A protein has these predicted regions:
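Conserved lysine of the Walker
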Residues: 12-13
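Hydrophobic anchor at the beta1->P-loop junction of P-loop NTPases
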Residues: 4
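Conserved nucleotide-sensing/catalytic segment adjacent to the nucleotide-binding pocket
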Residues: 42-89
Length: 175
C-alpha cells in the first residue's frame, strides 16, 4: 500500500491521475481511479466496489482523498488483508494518520510519500522549461557572483517572483 500525503493544493490529485495515465493502459482495465469525495460512497464502504473490481481482474486501486471515506483507515486495512495481491495507492492530507486517530496497522503496511510545494527554483524550472540546478549554502556564499552570471542570461527571476508568492508553491491547484 502506498500513501501520497500532502497539504491541500499541493497536487495529490494531479499526481495520481498522471500516475494512472503513465503506467496503466485504460483498455486493459487493470487500474481503477476513484475519488472518495463522491456521493457514491455516502453510507457505503469500499468492500463491494473492490470485490467487483478484483473479480474483473483489477490489479491496482487508486483512491484519491481516501480520508473522505467513513472509517477510511480501517477500510484500507480490511482491503489489504482481504485482497493481498491488490496494489492500493491512496492520497490523504498530511495531518491524517497522525496523533490520537492513528491506525498503527495502516502505518505498518503503508509506505508514505509526502508531496511538498515547489521551491522558487522548481517553480522557475516548471514555468520556463529550464533545468536550473541546486546549490549548497557554502556554494552560494562563496560563488554567488558566478552563479548569478550563469542564471541571469537564461531567466530574470524577479519577473516570476510575485507569481510564485501568489500561486507558485502550490502550482497545480490553479490548473
Amino acid at each position: 500500500m502506498i500513501a501520497i500525503r500532502g497539504p491541500r493544493g499541493v497536487g495529490r490529485t494531479s499526481f495520481l491521475l498522471e500516475f494512472a495515465k503513465e503506467f496503466f493502459d485504460p483498455q486493459l482495465h487493470q487500474a481503477l481511479y476513484i475519488s472518495a469525495n463522491n456521493f457514491y460512497f455516502q453510507g457505503r464502504g469500499l468492500q463491494e466496489l473492490v470485490h467487483e473490481f478484483v473479480d474483473r481482474g483489477g490489479q491496482v486501486l487508486i483512491i484519491d482523498q481516501a480520508f473522505k471515506l467513513p472509517n477510511w483507515k480501517d477500510q484500507l486495512v480490511e482491503i489489504y488483508h482481504a485482497y493481498p495481491y491488490l496494489r492500493v495507492v491512496f492520497s490523504t492530507t498530511s495531518v491524517h494518520g497522525e496523533g490520537a486517530n492513528a491506525n498503527h496497522e495502516l502505518d505498518r503496511i503503508t509506505r508514505s510519500y509526502v508531496l511538498h510545494g515547489f521551491s522558487f527554483r522548481e517553480y522557475i524550472n516548471q514555468q520556463t522549461g529550464l533545468e536550473l540546478g541546486t546549490y549548497t549554502l557554502p556554494q552560494i556564499l562563496e560563488g554567488h557572483e558566478t552563479i548569478l552570471k550563469a542564471i541571469l542570461p537564461k531567466v530574470r527571476p524577479q519577473e516570476h517572483f510575485q507569481d510564485y508568492l501568489h500561486h507558485g508553491y502550490y502550482p497545480f491547484c490553479w490548473l
